[in-house]
Amino acid sequence: YDGPGLLREFPQVTGIMVGEGEVTFREVLEQYLREAETAGQSEQQPESDSTEHQVADRRGTVAGKSVVERFGQIPGLCLASGYTAPRDLTDLTTLPFLYENMEPFTNRIIYYETSRGCPYRCSYCLSSIDKKVRLRDISVVKRELQFFLDQNVKQVKFIDRTFNCDHKHAMEIWRYF
């Protein structure tokens, strides 16, 4: 996609995440939280629902800081000024388990990922951009799958692009079931 073009087309958008978003999204949220904390400590900050504040935010300047000053150190972003540093691929085992509280997911399909990437080189597909597969640690996968079993989850949908391309990893999961 054309990140800079999208930002020109939609000037109210501050930036676009590029690549995997879990870590980048968290860091962007942390920046917004720091700004909210600072705004709460400042008596000069306009009310959050005021037109003046909304216009200032659309321009990307908050508390006198530009978008680059606010977000330029966060890897994996496209800003109007250009791209920040590329984000390294995330170790899948470090990603948090999203289903510890199953209440919101009662009678729903659970989406679960044990790997990312693709070893193939299909020209039409984005899944093979880096031509490698990353696996979530099998002991973590088994622990999380056991949680689903203990919670009597009716359906888990594996969303791995190429679940069975690492035969050993896939067979470990099948044997576990």
Feature locations, PLM:
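Short, solvent-exposed loop/turn segments at secondary-structure junctions
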Residues: 1, 21-24, 89-91, 119, ...
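Glycine-rich beta-alpha loop elements in corrinoid/cobalamin-binding modules
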Residues: 1-53, 57-86
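Generic intrinsically disordered, low-complexity segments enriched for polar/acidic and small residues
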Residues: 7, 22, 29, 50, ...
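Radical SAM enzyme [4Fe-4S]-AdoMet core and its adjacent flexible, acidic
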Residues: 8, 89, 173-174
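Radical SAM [4Fe-4S] cluster-binding motif and immediate context
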Residues: 63, 96-177
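N-terminal [4Fe-4S]-dependent radical SAM core
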Residues: 71-114
